[in-house]
Structure formats: C-alpha cells, structure tokens
A protein has these predicted regions:
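Serine-esterase "nucleophile elbow" of acetyl-processing enzymes
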Residues: 1-46, 56-62, 166
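Alpha-helical cap/lid subdomain in secreted, periplasmic
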Residues: 37, 56-177
Length: 177
C-alpha cells in the first residue's frame, strides 16, 4: 500500500530548534518512522506553512491511502474554527480517491508557547477535532484525533518535538495495522 501524507510543517518534519527552518532527520520524522514501522513506502507531502488548500490536490498516481492533517496554520493565520472546518469540508470534497482510502487526523491542539500567546488560538485548535469528526462521519472517512496521543510540542506551542514525532508515528501505526 502506497501511503501519501499530506500536511503542514509537522508532516514535513520541521525542527523548531533550527532558526532557519531546518528539518528533523529521517530517523525522527513521523512520516519516515511510520514507513519503517509499517514496512510500507510513504510519500511525504508536508510543507511548512501549508493551510488547507482551496482546491483539490494532484495525488501521485500510485497513491492508495491519503493521510491528511491540516488546520493548524489556518488557525494561526486568524481563521476561526468554523471557517477552518468549512475549508476542510470543501477540500475533502475535491479529493479524487475513495473516501475509505482517506484518513483525516485532527492535529494536536496548540499550546501556549513562543508562537501561541492567545487562548483564542488554543480554543480554535481544540474545536477542530469535533468539527473534523463530524465531517468524516458525513463522508464515511476514517478519522482520528491526535490530541488523545498526547504528542509533546516544542517551546513554540506548535511543532512536534523529536519525541512527539516518535509517539505520533507509533500511535498512527497502531491505528493502521
């Protein structure tokens, strides 16, 4: 099964300890760890700063499973939870893949940190989970909430720590097995 992981900087593997936007090495990025744990090839389509696309995406031809985790940057850019959820609904409806082959993940909620100084941001990020769960149920798309995995975030309140990547990959692998 060819897995495509589509997301933001946490999917990309951004290392917040590097001022210039460095990346964790492959041994510490959840996408690469997942590939190793499942013994399945994965394609990392994570991108720093990515918000939910307003149109569909061109998936690699060999894509069999699509894992989506987005919404954090939309919240950080000032969108309220209802707007983000509506964007996700529109995006999901544009994807040309059987819905059962998609996994929608609500990202871990933001925490107070160098990039997050507002309770409103944190609350908006928390509200994504229930909205995404509803969208997934309406479309018969598998869903999980990464908040239940207690993924450690770095000092910025946004990005996974190295340990966070390991926990995320392990929990996701258990879900996919």
């Amino acid at each position: 099964m060819r897995i495509v992981c589509f997301g933001d900087s946490n999917t990309y593997g951004y290392d917040p300890r590097d001022y210039f936007g460095g990346r964790y090495d492959a041994e510490n990025r959840w996408v690469d760890l997942l590939a190793k744990q499942l013994d399945q090839p994965t394609i990392n389509l994570g991108m720093n700063g990515r918000e939910i696309p307003r149109t569909g995406i061109a998936l690699p031809e060999e894509a069999e499973k699509l894992i989506i985790m987005l919404g954090t940057n939309d919240v950080l850019q000032g969108a309220d939870a209802d707007t983000v959820i509506a964007r996700m609904a529109h995006f999901l409806d544009q994807i040309k893949l059987p819905h059962t082959n998609i996994l929608l993940i609500a990202p871990p909620p933001l925490q107070r940190g160098a990039w997050v100084d507002s309770e409103e941001l944190i609350e908006a990020s928390i509200r994504l989970s229930a909205g995404y769960q509803r969208l997934a149920a309406e479309r018969n798309i598998p869903f999980t909430d990464a908040a239940v995995w207690h993924v450690p975030l770095a000092f910025d309140g946004v990005h996974f720590t190295g340990e966070g990547h390991r926990i995320f990959a392990q929990q996701l692998a258990l879900l996919l097995i």
